């Protein structure tokens, strides 16, 4: 087998293990990597690396299926999804499966079907992973040249990149098909408190779609996380889908330009580092979406955002005191600010008190009460609907920032048993996983650059901590 990596970068290298138990192509002498280096041992055996990737995909799909069935088994119809620690059923509900007006879950059978389909798919992938890891050819170059590769073959690597982009593009278009042709998506902004609807007029104007990309990520602009209607969400997926497909075919049909050949490091570890930073970026973006956005992460399923919980507290007390006879338009609080209503920095009428810090909140339950200059006094006095009152009261007691003592209306007491908002789970998990992936990117990028420069020699195993451990054989 042709060796694609110079072994000089791995020596002086020693192994604490019995060399007699090594397997050619997978032991430290032939690969330069010890057993704990994982897929690094498979750098030059494309068939076995394929097996590892397929098996990994099987594990991910298995988790999706098993966890979906776990959530279905523990689902309690009388409680909202966000009060039950669920993170997968909210995603399926957002896609319009099994959900009715107001975000009410009316049928969990679609979730059961999704879970079972993922389990079946994971079994197929698992079989493929085991086959390619244990039975299939070590390398694909001889038996299946179309699937073989040389890490240094820049044209082949960009072709593989193109294939991935095409598949990702079709994945984005699947959401578009679901939104327009297969039952629609759940729209939290639908009149009356949200409903599933067909998105039959997606935004195709590039100025609108790419306008999000050009927005500042700081302050109130919110970059792409600021999307606030389903037409833009679906239109964005149309643009992303066709752009990825077009870019994919571009990379399949062309060879990398000279500047790209010079600028990038072309090795397996370099490609790993590029992939890690891409996943890291997506994780960071997802964490911000989960925390701030209540359009693609509807509060009916994920619980209120921090600003939503704060504003709903002020709104709930306004409704209560107005019924008791308070003049909500003129009452002052202890600080001299409006107790119920006040003016924003830009002159709009907003909810009063300490909630002014979140005065720019946009949420489906309060938007119907706005006029051209903020909240409309006439609507506040005459048009508040029961569903708005109920939703605000529910959100007030399920703040993602829950604390035992409310400070300035930022968060109220989390009036539930063991309640942790799915927004908190999803935001923190994606942020820290994204950070870990970013560190992995720096590690592998540094090693790849050093190897390309010719001075990366690997870890000196003379002083390796594992040498102090009992041999595994």
Curated annotation (Swiss-Prot):
GO biological process assignments: photosynthetic electron transport in photosystem II
GO cellular component: chloroplast thylakoid membrane; photosystem II
Topology within the bilayer: Multi-pass membrane protein
Superkingdom assignment: Eukaryota
Keyword Phosphoprotein: yes
Main subcellular location: plastid
Cofactor descriptive note: Binds multiple chlorophylls and provides some of the ligands for the Ca-4Mn-5O cluster of the oxygen-evolving complex. It may also provide a ligand for a Cl- that is required for oxygen evolution. PSII binds additional chlorophylls, carotenoids and specific lipids.
Binding site for [CaMn4O5] cluster: 367
InterPro entries for this protein: PS_antenna-like, PS_II_antenna-like_sf, PSII_PsbC, PSII_PsbC_sf
Transmembrane segments: 69-93, 134-155, 178-200, 255-275, 291-312, 447-471
Keywords: Acetylation, Chlorophyll, Chloroplast, Chromophore, Manganese, Membrane, Metal-binding, Phosphoprotein, Photosynthesis, Photosystem II, Plastid, Thylakoid, Transmembrane, Transmembrane helix
UniProt subcellular location: Plastid, Chloroplast thylakoid membrane
N-acetylthreonine modifications at: 15
Record-linked HAMAP family: PSII_PsbC_CP43
Function: One of the components of the core complex of photosystem II (PSII). It binds chlorophyll and helps catalyze the primary light-induced photochemical processes of PSII. PSII is a light-driven water:plastoquinone oxidoreductase, using light energy to abstract electrons from H(2)O, generating O(2) and a proton gradient subsequently used for ATP formation.
Quaternary context: PSII is composed of 1 copy each of membrane proteins PsbA, PsbB, PsbC, PsbD, PsbE, PsbF, PsbH, PsbI, PsbJ, PsbK, PsbL, PsbM, PsbT, PsbX, PsbY, PsbZ, Psb30/Ycf12, at least 3 peripheral proteins of the oxygen-evolving complex and a large number of cofactors. It forms dimeric complexes.
Protein name: Photosystem II CP43 reaction center protein
Organism phylogeny: Eukaryota, Cryptophyceae, Pyrenomonadales, Geminigeraceae, Guillardia
Originating gene: psbC
């Amino acid at each position: 087998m042709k060796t694609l990596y110079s072994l000089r970068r791995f020596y002086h290298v020693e192994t604490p293990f019995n060399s007699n138990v090594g397997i050619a192509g997978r032991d430290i002498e032939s690969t330069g990597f010890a057993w704990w280096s994982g897929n690094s041992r498979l750098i030059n055996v494309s068939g076995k690396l394929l097996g590892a990737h397929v098996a990994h995909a099987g594990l991910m799909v298995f988790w999706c299926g098993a966890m979906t069935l776990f959530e279905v088994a523990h689902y309690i119809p009388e409680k909202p999804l966000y009060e039950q620690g669920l993170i997968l059923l909210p995603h399926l509900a957002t896609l319009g499966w099994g959900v009715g007006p107001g975000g009410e879950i009316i049928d969990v059978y679609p979730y059961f079907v999704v879970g079972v389909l993922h389990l079946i798919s994971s079994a197929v992938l698992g079989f493929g992973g085991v086959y390619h890891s244990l039975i299939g050819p070590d390398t694909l170059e001889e038996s299946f040249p179309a699937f073989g590769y040389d890490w240094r073959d820049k044209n082949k690597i960009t072709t593989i990149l193109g294939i991935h982009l095409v598949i990702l593009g079709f994945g984005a278009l699947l959401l578009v098909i679901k939104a327009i042709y297969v039952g629609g998506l759940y729209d939290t902004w639908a009149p009356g408190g949200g409903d599933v609807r067909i998105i039959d007029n997606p935004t195709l104007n590039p100025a609108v779609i790419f306008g999000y990309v050009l927005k500042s990520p700081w302050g109130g602009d919110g970059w792409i996380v600021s999307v606030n209607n389903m037409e833009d969400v679906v239109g964005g997926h149309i643009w992303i889908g066709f752009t990825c497909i077009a870019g994919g075919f571009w990379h399949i049909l062309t060879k990398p330009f000279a500047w790209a050949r010079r600028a990038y490091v072309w090795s397996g570890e370099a490609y790993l580092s590029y992939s890690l930073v891409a996943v890291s970026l997506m994780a960071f973006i997802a964490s911000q979406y989960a925390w701030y956005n209540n359009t693609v992460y509807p509060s009916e399923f994920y619980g209120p955002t921090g600003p939503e919980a704060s504003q709903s507290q002020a709104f709930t007390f306004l409704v209560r005191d107005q019924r008791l006879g308070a003049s909500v338009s003129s009452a002052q609080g202890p600080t001299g600010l409006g107790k119920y209503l006040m003016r924003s920095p830009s002159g709009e009428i907003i909810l009063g008190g300490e909630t002014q810090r979140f005065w720019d909140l946009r949420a489906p339950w309060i938007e119907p009460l706005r006029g051209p200059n903020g909240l409309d006094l006439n609507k506040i006095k005459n048009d508040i609907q029961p569903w708005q009152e109920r939703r605000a009261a529910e959100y007030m007691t399920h703040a993602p920032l829950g604390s035992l003592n409310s400070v300035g209306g930022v968060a109220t007491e989390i009036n539930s048993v063991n309640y942790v908002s799915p927004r908190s789970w999803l935001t923190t998990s994606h942020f820290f996983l994204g950070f870990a992936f970013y560190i992995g990117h720096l590690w592998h990028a540094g090693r790849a650059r050093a190897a390309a420069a010719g001075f990366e020699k690997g870890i000196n195993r003379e002083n390796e901590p594992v040498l102090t451990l009992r041999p595994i054989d």
